[in-house]
Swiss-Prot record:
Region (G2 motif) location: 178-186
Keyword Transmembrane: no
Name listed for the protein in its UniProt record: Guanine nucleotide-binding protein subunit alpha-11
CDD domains for this protein: G-alpha
Record lineage: Eukaryota, Metazoa, Chordata, Craniata, Vertebrata
Region (G1 motif): 41-54
SMART domains per UniProt: G_alpha (SM00275)
Annotated lipid attachment (S-palmitoyl cysteine): C9, C10
Gene designation: GNA11
Domain G-alpha: 38-359
Topology of this chain in the membrane: Lipid-anchor
Disulfides per UniProt: none
Region (G5 motif), start-end ranges: 329-334
Length: 359
């Protein structure tokens, strides 16, 4: 064999190998594209206590295996701790707001509850049960509860404190609603994947408090949709981290930052205006115009208030071509979330199919 023919032979082998590698790469790219279409990443964003973790719990109930008896048992201690935390917050606020107890015995009850180390609470027994019940029924504590926007109190405080008898029964097992209302601040990142119509939806919940947000950065790749939660009821509340900053202003600032991030240029944005039930209660006595003077709608009108808040957020979008999809929600209401997420899923799938030129 001549040198030329040997070289030609080697060359054709190299070309073959190169073609094979190229074909492999093309195949892998097609597979990646198909797999990317099969797994959609949904990033749940919003400030602290906007309802992100509750939303994930609902996905587990609606699209996952829900909560077994064993799972619910795991929440018992957390329900007890939420009760003590709520009452301790109100006892501290009684002093700060200089509100007096109506019944003398409640001074001693307050001392008893205040000295409890919440982290160590594992049970809910006497004398704590009657102390908390008696305190909750004190007109002073009720006045303090009505002024809760002036300090930090969990949204589920009234839900649990009004049901102390049931929760204190021996062998108590938390209900699904008890589980949905448990407040545990999210630290770090929680992922919840679920399968829908042969597509994996990977929902990622990141902590909303300021200290948690710096951990978000690596979640930003390949995000199909941003699901941004706003608590409608926060228009008159201040931040956990800073008691002279309005929570809704903080939420607006975060939303503005998120929708202008270059990472999210190709991600759809879905805005959940959450806690609509709390807004309906609160709007009757706390006027939106006192916190947002530009509001010129009627007072005590939840519909006008929520439309104004929606417009405030949508107006932050600088890109007229980018549609912001919005829904009013109540994250603790399973049927409401089932209905809303069905619409959201259709939106996400349609947009995703468009991106892959499949429609």
């Amino acid at each position: 064999m001549t040198l030329e023919s040997m070289m030609a032979c080697c060359l054709s082998d190299e070309v073959k190998e190169s073609k094979r590698i190229n074909a492999e790469i093309e195949k892998q790219l097609r597979r990646d594209k198909r797999d990317a279409r099969r797994e959609l990443k949904l990033l749940l964003l919003g400030t602290g206590e906007s309802g992100k973790s509750t939303f994930i719990k609902q996905m587990r109930i609606i699209h996952g295996s829900g909560y077994s008896e064993e799972d619910k048992k795991g929440f018992t201690k957390l329900v007890y701790q939420n009760i003590f935390t709520a009452m301790q917050s109100m006892i501290r606020a009684m002093e700060t707001l200089k509100i007096l107890y109506k019944y003398e015995q409640n001074k001693a009850n307050a001392v008893l509850i205040r000295e409890v180390d919440v982290e160590k609470v594992m049970t809910f027994e006497q004398p704590y049960v009657s102390a908390i019940k008696t305190l909750w029924n004190d007109p002073g504590i009720q006045e303090c509860y009505d002024r809760r926007r002036e300090y930090q109190l969990s949204d589920s405080a009234k839900y649990y404190l009004s049901d102390v008898d049931r929760i204190a029964t021996p062998g108590y097992l938390p209900t699904q609603q008890d589980v949905l209302r448990v407040r545990v601040p999210t630290t770090g990142i929680i992922e919840y994947p679920f399968d829908l119509e042969n597509i994996i939806f990977r929902m990622v919940d990141v902590g909303g408090q300021r200290s948690e947000r710096r951990k978000w950065i690596h979640c930003f790749e390949n995000v199909t949709s941003i699901m941004f939660l706003v608590a409608l009821s926060e228009y008159d509340q201040v931040l956990v981290e800073s008691d002279n900053e309005n929570r809704m202003e903080e939420s607006k600032a975060l939303f503005r930052t998120i929708i202008t991030y270059p990472w999210f240029q190709n991600s759809s944005v879905i805005l959940f205006l959450n806690k609509k039930d709390l807004l309906e209660d609160k709007i009757l006595y706390s006027h939106l115009v006192d916190y947002f003077p530009e509001f010129d709608g009627p007072q005590r009108d939840a519909q006008a208030a929520r439309e104004f808040i929606l417009k405030m957020f949508v107006d932050l979008n600088p890109d007229s071509d980018k549609i912001i999809y919005s829904h009013f929600t109540c994250a603790t209401d399973t049927e409401n979330i089932r209905f809303v997420f069905a619409a959201v899923k259709d939106t996400i799938l349609q947009l995703n199919l468009k991106e892959y030129n499949l429609v």
